[in-house]
């Protein structure tokens, strides 16, 4: 084949052997008939079957591969022309409601160039199988090979051998390179098959719960207390992640350490890859959304591939699970265990939590001046993380009874303490509850604004504070919006008094709050109220002892505390209330209450200012401390908790 004799001026469309054969025929001069067979010994080869069994060189292999590709391209172009010819326009009629259009099923290229939108069933079209599209567009060589292997010839038993694909006659070098690419792609496809299976699940969360139970042998719900809101914050979180790459598993401990105070990490493997179970306590409280974004970035997995809930901390079984797995070699633990695990697994803490002491709860409520049942229950429950008695209270089935008993006992102690104090001791005690420093001048300026002489007002206030008979009631009267209620409410608030209302006068017990108060206020007394007081309450206004009816209790004898009354009616000018003139001291506020441009009060009547007012004028009001009390009181703070006796050796 290397001999090129007689092949000069070759044509562009003919090969060398054709020209040689033609020259031989014309130079021999032998007349060969068409019916006569050729001599088999002329060339020295057996030309019977016309098959050359000699070794095929590399050039011929590449030529055959090129010819194969050219034929495949030609066939593909022919098929595309037929599709364009017989399928018609790629546009679908607007009145057609066919979800699976013919052109979109045959060729994704035609479906991609549509200008009109077509409604599709999302759930059924989200993951199309390869059988629905026969064009092969967009599929890699690995996917095509997998498809052929899966759908083999049924006559051959489904052995998956490919027929008429053109790859059987390609060269050895091309096959070797493509085989390496197939192996790499097949490995990658095998790694992602589990993730694709997860994405195809209708309920991913249920699937994750099932996989978690298969891996760890217990339900994820058994370890957590579910949060309905994704915005609720918590410091402790239980996270289960699926489909994690093994390279991330090795570095996760170092990645999570700067963000957490404690981390309990467990790794297992399944068909989807690495599975992570971690109990983590962050340095700051985080919501579920924040935890999902943080761990999703560290683990390089989608947020819907994780189960994130806070742990169930009020369960000894759950705490024991984390404790036992933490000391085994199957887990990696970072930091100190949370107190709720230590509390329920260490014997000393368990014994301390077993008994509840009501006296400690009452002492706490008394020290914090909390007497309302709802406030006691809420505030004391929040101490469960660091107070053993509060923890025992939370574990008790009698919380409502304990709260009620605590509130009753606290009110009894507070009432007895108030009754024991004189008015000057009470004012000093109320002043200790105000931390800020005020100014007494705004109160004096407000009284001058209402045309009230300060010295006469101070003398009347002194008699009122000490409960002098016939001077036990002060009435602030005047037109509306003059600051009567504001002035009296601020004074009652500082002195810790009570407020009664005539709206409850139909009840026999509407005066019952007077039994537990040091001072009192009756706001906005109308004509019927003054009539009622003139008829039934003359003895009370005198400041003399009188009996008060209390609900579910016997009548009690009390001395009415100093009483403030606000009204728009000036009883000093009403003749029909002449019997109240000597019992009620009246001050008139004629001017409107002043405000600045921003709507703030010009004269601030705050607790700090009232504290400064009584401290500044204590000598004029006869409430200053005596010489015996200047060095401090010798009385100890109230204690209702039994103390421990220390025996000396």
From Swiss-Prot:
Residues 452-602 form the SF3 helicase domain. A motif (Nuclear localization signal) lies at residues 83-85. It comes from the Viruses. Phosphorylated. Sumoylated. ATP binds at residues 478-485. The keyword ATP-binding applies. The keyword Phosphoprotein applies. It is found in: Host nucleus. PROSITE patterns: SF3_HELICASE_1. The modification Phosphoserine is found at residues 89, 93, 107. Changing residue 89 to A: About 60% loss of nuclear localization. GO terms for molecular function: ATP binding; ATP hydrolysis activity; DNA binding; DNA helicase activity; TPR domain binding. Its EC number is 5.6.2.4. One of its GO terms (biological process) is DNA replication. It catalyses: Couples ATP hydrolysis with the unwinding of duplex DNA by translocating in the 3'-5' direction; ATP + H2O = ADP + phosphate + H(+). Keywords: ATP-binding, DNA replication, DNA-binding, Early protein, Helicase, Host nucleus, Hydrolase, Isomerase, Isopeptide bond, Nucleotide-binding, Phosphoprotein, Ubl conjugation. InterPro entries: Helicase_SF3_DNA-vir (IPR014015), P-loop_NTPase (IPR027417), PPV_DNA_helicase_E1_C (IPR001177), PPV_DNA_helicase_E1_N (IPR014000), PPV_E1_DBD (IPR046832), PPV_E1_DBD_sf (IPR046935), Rep_E1_papillomaV (IPR016393), Znf_lg_T-Ag_D1_dom_sf (IPR037102). Belongs to the papillomaviridae E1 protein family. ATP-dependent DNA 3'-5' helicase required for initiation of viral DNA replication. It forms a complex with the viral E2 protein. The E1-E2 complex binds to the replication origin which contains binding sites for both proteins. During the initial step, a dimer of E1 interacts with a dimer of protein E2 leading to a complex that binds the viral origin of replication with high specificity. Then, a second dimer of E1 displaces the E2 dimer in an ATP-dependent manner to form the E1 tetramer. HAMAP family: PPV_E1. This is Replication protein E1. It comes from Human papillomavirus 11.
